[in-house]
């Protein structure tokens, strides 16, 4: 299979290297030059998009994750079978999919007629991510998803739990995305407002992707454009 790799954390982020390892060091990288977390489905249409080659099959794009998908499937790797975005440092569950550049990259792929997977790693602060573990479980997830039916205009959204040594091995669970809002809270300093919503305090509807992931399992949802 031919893989196109992208993300929203940037081409130098450890997550895309972990993704590459999970795919057996296969695939073409077309990823943002800079960090674009939370950019949503923004695309560049009114100015040039600069691209810098970073060695064989690696391209750093001065644009958004959705720009990277467009350039990748149209110009750099039109023979791609799967577009895969991640591994994102932070969860992309429930309504996060509207905000996430990672999810936007694969939504764009689905719009353009390609199979796609977004994969993210929830961060249970103050823990840090074990990228070797993330790569191991990403590989297991992919081997499951290759066998699943994926209708046109649909894509997979995967969220890894924050596992640490001593925790039970996670199960792979297909589930529904949460529809609950993110916590919205701000602190005020003068005329400045600072977002202070606590991600880990999100509502946990039983069986939702948030509940599955926060419970220590791998949450997989099938989303549509």
UniProtKB/Swiss-Prot annotation:
EC number, as in UniProt: 3.1.3.5
GO molecular function: 5'-nucleotidase activity; metal ion binding; nucleotide binding
Keyword tags: Cytoplasm, Hydrolase, Metal-binding, Nucleotide-binding
Binding positions for a divalent metal cation per the UniProt entry: 8-9, 37, 88
GO cellular component terms attached to this protein's record: cytoplasm
Top-rank taxon: Bacteria
Co-factor remark: Binds 1 divalent metal cation per subunit.
Location of the protein in the cell: Cytoplasm
Reactions performed catalytically: a ribonucleoside 5'-phosphate + H2O = a ribonucleoside + phosphate
Cofactor(s) needed: a divalent metal cation
Predominant place of localization: cytoplasm
Function: Nucleotidase that shows phosphatase activity on nucleoside 5'-monophosphates.
NCBIfam families, A to Z: PRK00346.2-3, surE
UniProt family annotation: Belongs to the SurE nucleotidase family.
Protein's name in the database: Putative 5'-nucleotidase alr3139
Lineage of source species: Bacteria, Bacillati, Cyanobacteriota, Cyanophyceae, Synechococcales
